[in-house]
Swiss-Prot record:
The keyword Ligase does not apply. This is Selenoprotein F. InterPro entries: Sep15/SelM_sf, Sep15_SelM, Sep15_SelM_dom, Thioredoxin-like_sf. The lineage of its organism: Eukaryota, Metazoa, Chordata, Craniata, Vertebrata. It is found in: Endoplasmic reticulum lumen. The gene is selenof.
Length: 157
């Protein structure tokens, strides 16, 4: 029953946001369950699963494929974590302790005492270009984001 209440609440929120034409922040999109890494063509598939009602919000959260094709690949990234706090972030812990980090060219795992998990994307000069917090990301979101931003060595791992 609580799932139905949540869906009704979500639908009313979507209708309100759509009515005002509000642009959603990437954080708001994540809280609604949408990844900003999704291509807008994914939103078009929602109708096949009887989810057409959430399509307007999906469209506000997605990236146009044109932008994705011309996306910038960063030469490197640093994933900073604290070894003692890693257990509080099981999704990040699962990613760090798996073989997945080896898939990404230029990805370094750096253990920084007391640090919450954060990803630092580096430009050609080694300066921080983007610094998204990954506190609430799951393992798949981290992997998907890195596959969009870094060169991938081997996807067979």
């Amino acid at each position: 029953m609580s799932g139905e209440v949540y869906i009704l609440w979500l639908l009313s929120l979507i209708q309100t946001l759509s009515a005002y034409g509000a642009d959603l922040s990437s954080e708001a999109c994540r809280e609604l369950g949408f990844s900003s890494c999704w291509g807008c063509s994914s939103c078009d598939l929602l109708g096949e699963f009887s989810l057409s009602s959430i399509q307007p919000v999906c469209k506000q959260c997605c990236q146009q494929e044109v932008h994705m094709e011309s996306r910038k690949l960063y030469p490197g990234a640093i994933l900073e974590v604290c070894g003692u706090k890693l257990g509080r972030f099981p999704q990040v812990q699962a990613f760090v302790r798996s073989d997945k980090p080896k898939m990404f060219k230029g990805l370094q795992i750096k253990y920084v005492r007391g640090a919450d998990p954060i990803l630092k994307l580096l430009d050609d000069n080694g300066n921080i270009a983007e610094e998204p917090s990954i506190l609430k990301w799951n393992t798949d979101s981290v992997e998907e984001f890195l596959s969009e931003k870094l060169e991938v060595y081997n996807t067979d791992l």
